[in-house]
Design a protein with these regions (language model features):
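Structured recognition/catalytic domains enriched at protein termini
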Residues: 1-103
């Protein structure tokens, strides 16, 4: 876990479109690390899960009830989601379900 923990919270609404970004380290980039955000030979799906917490600054995940809100796999051209993540320099966009509460 990176220290210190962040102190900022971003409020989001059900139905909002969000983007997540993956990298090997906080300062790695595809220009400095050819395997960033992930080795291009690592093929597979991408999934996003959420869990309800009292605060987005919660530091433990013990006992949380996780649920999947996004999954991307292999497309009709045979390209895996991780390949699209690699080609998009570590970024993936997804939409929060409209049926959940607004949150952080």
């Amino acid at each position: 876990m990176n220290q210190p923990l962040p102190k900022d919270i971003i409020n989001v609404k059900a139905g909002d479109k969000l983007a997540a970004e993956w990298h090997h380290t906080l300062d790695s980039t595809p220009e400095t690390d050819k395997s960033d955000p992930i080795d291009p030979g690592h093929l597979g799906p991408i999934m996003v899960y959420l869990a309800k917490v009292d605060s987005a600054l919660t530091t433990t995940v013990t006992g949380l009830k996780w649920f999947k809100i996004y999954e991307d796999g292999m497309d009709s051209n045979g390209t895996w989601a991780v390949t699209r993540l690699y080609n998009n320099k570590g970024k993936v966009e997804f939409t929060l379900p409209k049926c959940i509460q607004n949150g952080q």
